[in-house]
Structures are given as structure tokens and as C-alpha cells.
Amino acid sequence: MTDTLNPLVAAQEKVRIACEKLGCDPAVYELLKEPQRVIEISIPVKMDDGTVKVFKGWRSAHSSAVGPSKGGVRFHPNVNMDEVKALSLWMTFKGGALGLPYGGGKGGICVDPAELSERELEQLSRGWVRGLYKYLGDRIDIPAPDVNTNGQIMSWFVDEYVKLNGERMDIGTFTGKPVAFGGSEGRNEATGFGVAVVVRESAKRFGIKMEDAKIAVQGFGNVGTFTVKNIERQGGKVCAIAEWDRNEGNYALYNENGIDFKELLAYKEANKTLIGFPGAERITDEEFWTKEYDIIVPAALENVITGERAKTINAKLVCEAANGPTTPEGDKVLTERGINLTPDILTNSGGVLVSYYEWVQNQYGYYWTEAEVEEKQEADMMKAIKGVFAVADEYNVTLREAVYMYAIKSIDVAMKLRGWY
């Protein structure tokens, strides 16, 4: 395995190993190694200067074994079909670990949204829905926000879908909507809240006291921000935060006594950057990755913990809040060095869990308070965490292997009952 392994091949290998360790019928791997449906579309957009550009878009529906497909849509210049297929596979197992009635889905458009005007972005978003309309629906495939997409884009998605659907207000076809338009309280904070719960429980499992732990978080976007906030709420102390600046590149902040979340957030809102924050010293990105911590939480980019970087990480536990932050080679090195790891499929699953709550609330037209959402989320995540930990102990496997195995158990039963093998 190398750091450049195709993401789909890497995901398939994890599924193969999990099926093998469980002693599954060979048909289980055959049914799960490839998506059931992948659609590629071309989306023409009339630009503000009068020219027409055509953008490539995709939607992958990995499995319908237990229910409709569910997963985000990303707008990014590096999106491609293999990435979308791999991410849809991961979503099947993320939902399976949580016991959700979903298979995995993922979509994308190859575009840098920063280069588009708001009008162009809206036309592109609506074009994606038009191209995929007959494959979407609250009982077919349910998209949500992902990289560079948000509640506004989900609102355009819904509006276009309703126009195509004979004005039926099937707003549950998309989640991650603003609260004013059928969204759920707690959705914006859901992933970071869930990460903090997983960090807390993983710390207990590996004998780390949260109140004494030195914790580092890479990234202060949506996931990183709410991870830091909720780790602090759980009694933890974040002493290092790494971030990126358009002008100055990668950098980090460090305070061994802990960085105050409220002060940091107020500084960022006032200055649009963390650079110059008086409550911590600025350090380099390289220093961030080599300092001594109890727990490190990559919450930004994929493939940041490479084989080389894994050799210098000085922590007892890695909790993957980002999607795919550890390369296969990095994973191998961490395991060899005895550094424990809680995988992304479990750690960052809070987002899809609260998306599920949004979908449920849309069906009933009855909406919960933020406190009710948090209570339900913690209970459901605790069930998944305990289940994954139990599988790891029963089979003497890593937590990454265990989360796939735990998910496969329920998916396997559904496929067998449906007569798929």
C-alpha cells in the first residue's frame, strides 16, 4: 500500500478485510465492493459574460440494502468519479454503524465555487438537480451539504426539485437545509458535537483522562470549530489548533495551558483570521504535528497523516474528524508505533445522524429543540461507539477494522433477508 492509493481501491480493501474477518459469504463482498448506480452528467451554465461553460457532475448510490442512499454533494476542482464512488461506499458503512435506514450516497461537481458569481453558482446548483432529478427523492437518494456546499445551496436544490416534481413539497429529499426552511436545530454543530463525544469515549478506552489531556485540533472550519467548543464542554483542554490562511499558508496556535474557545471565536469573527490571537503563540505547521499531545484530531483535509508524518506524530491517540485524513501507509505506521486511532467513519458520523433526524422531522412536520437533538444524538452515538468497541474486543482488531465489521453485520442480514444471495 502507498500514500497514493486510489481512494476506491483503499475503501474496497477495508471492506474485503472486514468481510474476511467476519467469515461472511463471498457474495457479501461482491455486493458491497461497487456502487449500485453511478450517474455522470454535464451541466451547461451561461456565465455572466455571456459565454457557456459545461461542468461535470456525479452522483453515486452505493447500496440500497437497508434504505435510500444518503450523503453529501461537494463542489471542488479535484472531485472525480472514483472519489465520489469511494465516499458513497464510506457513507454506507457510516450509516450502518449508526443503525440508520440508509445506504451510502455521494455527489459532486468539478468546480471551484470561489470563481463563480452567486448567480452562476445558483444556476450550476439547479442544473445538478435537473440532471439527476429522476434518481433523487426522500425514498430514493437524499443529498446533503459537503465540501463547499451549504444550506443556501440545499435550498436551491429543494426549490428546483419541487418545480420538477409537480410542486410536491418533498423537502425531505435534501437535508442540511436552514432551520427556516425545514432544517433541524443542531445540524450545524452536529459533526463537531459528535467528534467530542467520540474523543471523550476513546480517551476513556485508552486510559487518557480528558481533564488532564493535551489535545490538538487541525482545522478551525465548521467541524474544527465545533469540535473545539464541545471538547471544552466535555471538560477537555485544546492546547493547539492548526489553520490555513490564504496569504500566509499553514500555521498553528499553541498554549500548553489551553486555548480559550470563546476568546478565539470572538477574535476570528472580528479579524477573519486566527493570526495575531493574543491568547496563544504562533507556531509552524510542522511544529504543530511534532509537539507532544495526548490526543490529536485532524479535522480539515484528507491525506494529512502520511507515512512520513506518522513517524513523527507524538500522541497517544488520533481521532479522525476529517474524511480520510490518514493514508494507508500512515495508518500502518501509526499501528506499528502503537498509536491508537478512532476512524473517521465513527468519529465524524454526527453530521449524517442529525441529517437523519432532519429527514424524520420533515416526514412528520414536527421539529425538536436543539437540546432534544443533542440528547438523541449523544444516545445514538453512544450505542454505535459501544458496538464498535465491543467488536474490536471480540475479534481483537483495530477500531478501523471494527467499524466496518460492525456495520457489515446489519447490512449482511438485510441483504440475506431480501434474497440478494
UniProtKB/Swiss-Prot annotation:
Pathway: Amino-acid degradation; L-glutamate degradation via hydroxyglutarate pathway; crotonoyl-CoA from L-glutamate: step 1/5. InterPro entries: Aminoacid_DH-like_N_sf, Glu/Leu/Phe/Val/Trp_DH, Glu/Leu/Phe/Val/Trp_DH_C, Glu/Leu/Phe/Val/Trp_DH_dimer, Glu/Leu/Phe/Val_DH_AS, Glu_DH, NAD(P)-bd_dom_sf, NAD_bind_Glu_DH. The keyword Transit peptide does not apply. CDD domains: NAD_bind_1_Glu_DH (cd01076). SUPFAM superfamilies: Aminoacid dehydrogenase-like, N-terminal domain (SSF53223), NAD(P)-binding Rossmann-fold domains (SSF51735). Changing E243D: Shows a 9-fold relaxation of the strong discrimination against NADPH due to the decrease of binding affinity for NADH and the increase for NADPH. GO terms for molecular function: glutamate dehydrogenase (NAD+) activity. This is NAD-specific glutamate dehydrogenase. It comes from Peptoniphilus asaccharolyticus.
